[in-house]
Amino acid sequence: MNQQTDKAILVVSFGTSYEASRKATIEKIEQDIRNAFQDHRIYRAWTSKFIISILKKRDNYTVPTVKEALEQMITDGIREVVVQPTHILDGIENNIMKEEVLSYKESFDKIAFGTPLLADSKDESQAINAVTTEFSDLKETEALVFMGHGTTHQVNTVYAGLDQKFKESAHANVFIGTVEVDPAIHDLVKEVTSFQPSKIYVTPFMIVAGNHAHNDMAGDSPDSWVCQFENAGFEVCPIIKGLGEYPGIRRMYVEHAQKAIDSMK
């Protein structure tokens, strides 16, 4: 990293209280970006003040907020900022973050935003290829079910669109739903049941494998996705692996950051 440069990339994540997943996902994305852009200084910020507070109290581990990271950049003499979120969609969390960053626009010469993971149909196709590559040994008789987070923002329609795209790209045994909104688990159980798989793999469609993955997806509660599929009569295997562990997904964030840098020229 060039300590003398006045150019920086701020990698913004929601955050996670799960150390192992943080190291395997968020930190891997940050490292890939650091390796790709050695003429930029790399900064980190998380948007979840709740998780930041937990880590500070529990582990004495400090993560800056977006505001704190921007203030540090000003102190360090940064003039050009690329903000690369590790969010999946350009939804509520991402929009709040962008507003916060833009409140500092007078403090920098240039600010550009990289897009979240899924910004257009090309991203969707690339993401599908990245995740299906990781499950290339999935048998035709088996089903792969992704748990997305979901949002009340209108971009939530991306999940239903992704599910359809999986089917259109010769992956009829791949399904995706969300934990917060539609497509919901009860709809997924019906859809997967009609497929009659010999085995179901359930894994998060989230950057980190955190609380949702460990509890809502793979927990012992009757409401967990694993339990609901088991109650429907299926053999279920949870895979606690965040999207940030997939090289193809991390590569997409690097590409999005590059596009943002190019837009500043």
Regions found by a protein language model. Give the residues of each.
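Active-site-proximal alpha-helix that buttresses catalytic centers in soluble enzyme cores
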Residues: 1-265
